[in-house]
Amino acid sequence: MAQSIIRTTKAPALALTPTQFSQQHFDLLNQQLRIYFNTVDAFTSTLSTADGGSSLSIPHIAASDSTDQIATGNDIPTVINFNTLDSGLGWTLNAPGSATAGFSGVYTIRYSLQFVNTANAIHNATVWLKVNNVDLANSATSFSIPARKSVGVPSYVAGYSEATFEINSGDEIELYWATDLAGDPTTPTDGVYIYHDTAQTVPYARPAIPSALGSITFVSRL
């Protein structure tokens, strides 16, 4: 279904009134006002429909990451990477994964992290937000990842959470995580890490599994 386009309105530069009545000037003035009010009507009627919100452009960002993410060490805070901008307006994605706000407002951030545990015991991971490299109060969430099923068969948990908070233009937002046992599939070292996988065709076709998915959406002005 095609989306309606909102066209902004601008007051016309009305023709100057002559010292004496002029039918030509009167007709021109009516024409200018008619065009202007038609534009205003089109603007308000588009917004007042059931799908009026679909015509608006709202600040947002959505990003993902296509790599395994390894904690720096046991119980050491580590930044979460996002290497792919999936969609964005009014935000900038910076390497290795922070996002900078272009507009002030109240925003909601949502994320999903594909945790893997290759160890033979349950282990925990905690995720939280930083704004301008300062921990955001009440933004942490803990996840418990079960012990592996067997050697070479890890357990998986999709760690999801969200938070709503105020952001000023220019603020830099980051996700951090830590785990009590940092795993590394390249060593290999048993423990917890954030897992990714490419798309597959067998035994069934499916898309790639990002290690991290995140989005920030505008809720309200400050």
Ranges and model annotations:
Residues 1-23, 220-222:
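Short, intrinsically disordered N-terminal pre-domain segments
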Residues 23-37, 41-44, 48:
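Long amphipathic alpha-helical coiled-coil
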Residues 16, 23-27, 81, 101:
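Alpha-helical interaction segments
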